[in-house]
């Protein structure tokens, strides 16, 4: 009896144990990452030929304690390598694990190689050569703490390489994991199986091979036992012949069918090639088709199983499309696949909840470094009385109501950018802004008392409902997360896409960037204030402080300002402002752009202006500013400097976003100024629900 070890992906050990026992293995013992078992020579070859789950089958040769590199060398050399392979064979060493002595796996592999070579040369035998790419023998050494385990890898290449996949193609899951996923679906061979996002077809091919009794090792050309001295070619040929006979019989007797589709024509072509090479091409129909086009291939029965490994995203900007995809799949399953089973394997359990289906079973597994889950569902048959479930129904109804109200109003006003929803319902705590045919959903960060998983699921529901109600393509929705009322944070960079969208606001054309920054380049709540500045600016010298992207300057310029001066500390935003001015034909010496700390510039400037717009941050302690700034504490010092720049008869429009801001009217009077609050006049319909979003004042000489 041979003592053997079969390695596998984390989470599949029990499944592998059952498989090995069915092959005839005895004394199976599950450990993390694999199964120890025993079997005769025939079982060695059967496990290599028939295991769909094992990553490798290894023959343990011994263990040694490693307190120094010499210990490793001597421990390896103690094995009788001349009984393992012949001098003319090539070999390679795979070394994994480190300890205080062996701190580099390449160094460990070198010491093992030296020990093996010396074992031959000391017997005056020719030294075996190393071949890292295609060796006859693979030696596996795993170092854990002070113990090195040495084994012969009888697989050669990993057993996931069945011999049918184009090696140039990238597979999101290995074939061994794909086989496990198929086994866990509850799918019964002989019933239909469909994968609507099949990629290169791995899941369907593994299922078809399982259903037709085709051994996973049947198409492999190389094995790790080819140079093994104890290899029994006769028994191997018997095992191989039996596998070929069973495969022919299984294919001839199988009558059901498999269906695969994907939106990418290139991967579908690869899937067809892979299926043909696997010997089951005639059983699978592959189509180029998007999930939105998915239909039941057997509407009159029999019932089958839908199985897939749908895409998932690690970046926030990919989530809206994925949420829409999962939500759509859930609706299609309910509408067209009643009575079928559904099994999805994913690294994002939150996305699976977008299906709006209740899972009957779930399994955990590792896909490389990723923690994944497989969930199985049974789709109930629809009845004449059943109505499709609405996702976030209260939110969807409110958004639909707001859309009807604001869409017509915005068209009449001549604006393309407006707020559709602003946390109208406390449990749906987001803002939804429209920018032409794009939509930005901003999630206000939930309180720490709210369960993070529930908050994320609520957000996914919001996105699915938003896409559905507004009828937009998922790639036209941008998702952001922000803290409520923590200042504008306008300088926070989120991305590097550099994609700008031209929008209109009354008679102005402006550039917005929906993806690269927390804000988009256009504060929608100041829309009416900008229009007022345009109406007030004819023939006047206009100053815009803390200008951001200069949208207020554009309105002033279009309103007929004699000159405009735009000041901001950020070069990025000044360049953006320049683009906005140029877009509206506002160029030349009359339109100055100044990069400076606005407070310092204000203290030193000695020019005069008829109209000044200033929208300072609530609080700032930027390293590039000389002093920390607090708008409540420091607004009088600001007014003192502004008065010095204000021409007789001039006006200051002063705005800020501090909730509960109190204007120091007595302080203004001492400066010879008076203030008229115009906050309510500057709130348009889409911001009427949030009366504290900003404060706005007109300040003139008393």
Curated annotation (Swiss-Prot):
Assigned EC number: 2.1.1.173, 2.1.1.264
Annotated Gene3D superfamilies: 3.30.2130.30, RNA methyltransferase domain (HRMD) like (3.30.750.80), Vaccinia Virus protein VP39 (3.40.50.150)
Domain (THUMP): residue spans on this chain: 43-154
Keywords: Cytoplasm, Methyltransferase, RNA-binding, rRNA processing, S-adenosyl-L-methionine, Transferase
Enzyme class: transferase
Statement: the UniProt record of this protein carries the keyword Hydrolase: no
One Pfam family here: THUMP
SMART domains for this protein: THUMP
Predominant location: cytoplasm
Molecular function as annotated in GO: 23S rRNA (guanine(2445)-N(2))-methyltransferase activity; RNA binding; rRNA (guanine-N7-)-methyltransferase activity
GO CC annotation terms, alphabetical: cytoplasm
Compartmental location: Cytoplasm
SUPFAM superfamilies cross-referenced by the UniProt entry: S-adenosyl-L-methionine-dependent methyltransferases
Reaction(s) the record says it catalyses: guanosine(2445) in 23S rRNA + S-adenosyl-L-methionine = N(2)-methylguanosine(2445) in 23S rRNA + S-adenosyl-L-homocysteine + H(+); guanosine(2069) in 23S rRNA + S-adenosyl-L-methionine = N(2)-methylguanosine(2069) in 23S rRNA + S-adenosyl-L-homocysteine + H(+)
Highest taxon listed in the record's lineage: Bacteria
InterPro entries in alphabetical order: 23SrRNA_methyltr_KL (IPR017244), DNA_methylase_N6_adenine_CS (IPR002052), RlmKL-like_Mtase (IPR000241), RlmKL-like_Mtase_CS (IPR053943), RlmL_1st (IPR054170), SAM-dep_methyl-trfase (IPR019614), SAM-dependent_MTases_sf (IPR029063), THUMP_dom (IPR004114)
PANTHER family given in the database record: RIBOSOMAL RNA LARGE SUBUNIT METHYLTRANSFERASE K/L, RIBOSOMAL RNA LARGE SUBUNIT METHYLTRANSFERASE K_L
Cited function: Specifically methylates the guanine in position 2445 (m2G2445) and the guanine in position 2069 (m7G2069) of 23S rRNA.
Protein family according to the UniProt entry: Belongs to the methyltransferase superfamily. RlmKL family.
Name the UniProt record assigns to this protein: Ribosomal RNA large subunit methyltransferase K/L
Species this chain originates from: Shigella sonnei (strain Ss046)
Gene: rlmL
């Amino acid at each position: 009896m041979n003592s053997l070890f079969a390695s596998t992906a984390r989470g599949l050990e029990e499944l592998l144990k059952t498989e090995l026992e069915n092959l005839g293995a005895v004394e199976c013992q599950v450990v993390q990452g694999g199964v120890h078992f025993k079997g005769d020579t025939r079982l060695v070859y059967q496990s290599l030929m028939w295991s769909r789950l094992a990553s490798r089958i290894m023959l343990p040769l011994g263990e040694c304690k490693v307190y120094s590199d010499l210990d490793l060398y001597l421990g390896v050399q103690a094995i009788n390598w001349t009984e393992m392979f012949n001098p003319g064979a090539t070999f390679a060493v795979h070394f994994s694990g480190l300890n205080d002595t062996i701190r580099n796996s390449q160094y460990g592999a070198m010491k093992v190689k030296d020990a093996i070579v010396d074992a031959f040369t000391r017997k005056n035998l020719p030294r075996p050569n190393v071949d890292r790419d295609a060796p006859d023998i693979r030696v596996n050494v795993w170092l854990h703490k002070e113990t090195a385990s040495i084994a012969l890898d009888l697989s050669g290449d990993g057993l996931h390489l069945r011999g049918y996949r184009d090696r140039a193609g990238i597979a999101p899951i290995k074939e061994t994991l794909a086989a496990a996923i198929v086994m866990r679906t509850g799918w019964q061979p002989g019933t239909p199986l469909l994968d609507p996002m099949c990629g290169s077809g791995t899941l369907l091919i593994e299922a078809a091979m399982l259903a037709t009794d085709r051994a996973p090792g049947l198409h492999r050309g190389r094995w790790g036992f080819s140079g093994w001295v104890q290899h029994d070619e006769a028994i191997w040929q018997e095992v191989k012949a039996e596998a070929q006979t069973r495969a022919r019989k299984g294919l001839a007797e199988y009558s059901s069918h498999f269906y695969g589709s994907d939106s990418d024509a290139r991967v579908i072509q690869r899937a067809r090639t892979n299926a043909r090479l696997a010997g089951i091409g005639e059983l699978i129909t592959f189509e180029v088709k998007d999930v939105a086009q998915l239909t039941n291939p057997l509407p009159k029965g029999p019932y089958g199983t839908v199985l897939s490994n749908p895409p998932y995203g690690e970046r926030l900007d990919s989530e809206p499309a994925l949420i829409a995809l999962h939500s759509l799949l859930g609706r299609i399953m309910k509408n067209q696949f009643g009575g079928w089973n559904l099994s999805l394997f994913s690294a994002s359990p939150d996305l699976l909840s977008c299906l709006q289906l209740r899972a009957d079973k779930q399994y955990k597994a590792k896909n490389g470094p990723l923690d994944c889950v497989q969930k199985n569902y049974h789709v109930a048959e629809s009845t004449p009385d059943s109505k499709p479930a609405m996702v976030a129904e209260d939110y969807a109804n409110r958004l639909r109501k707001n859309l009807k109200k604001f869409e017509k109003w915005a068209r009449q006003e001549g604006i393309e950018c407006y707020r559709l929803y602003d946390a109208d319902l406390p449990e749906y705590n987001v803002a939804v802004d429209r920018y032409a045919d794009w939509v930005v959903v901003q999630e206000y960060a939930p309180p720490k008392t709210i369960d993070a998983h529930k908050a994320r699921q609520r957000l996914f529901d919001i996105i699915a409902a938003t896409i559905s109600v507004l009828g937009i393509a998922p790639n036209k929705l941008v998702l952001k997360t922000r803290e409520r009322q923590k200042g504008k944070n306008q300088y926070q960079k989120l991305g590097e896409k550099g994609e700008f969208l031209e929008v209109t606001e009354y008679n102005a054309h402006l550039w917005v960037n929906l993806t690269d920054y927390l804000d988009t380049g256009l504060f929608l709540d100041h829309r009416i204030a900008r229009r007022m500045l345009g109406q007030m600016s004819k023939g006047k010298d206009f100053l815009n402080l803390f200008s951001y992207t200069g949208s207020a300057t554009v309105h002033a310029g279009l309103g007929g300002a004699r000159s405009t001066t735009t000041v901001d500390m950020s070069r990025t935003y000044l360049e953006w402002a320049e683009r906005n001015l140029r877009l509206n034909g506002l160029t030349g010496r009359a339109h100055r752009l100044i990069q400076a700390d606005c407070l310092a510039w204000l203290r030193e400037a000695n020019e005069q202006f008829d109209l000044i717009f200033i929208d300072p941050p609530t609080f700032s302690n930027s390293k590039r500013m000389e002093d920390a700034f607090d708008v409540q504490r420091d607004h009088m010092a600001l007014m003192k400097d502004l008065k010095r720049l204000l021409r007789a008869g001039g006006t200051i429009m002063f705005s800020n976003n501090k909730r509960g801001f109190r204007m120091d009217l007595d302080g203004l009077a001492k400066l010879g100024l008076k203030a008229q609050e115009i906050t309510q006049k500057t709130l348009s319909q889409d911001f009427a629900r949030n009366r504290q979003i900003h404060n706005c004042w007109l300040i003139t000489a008393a």
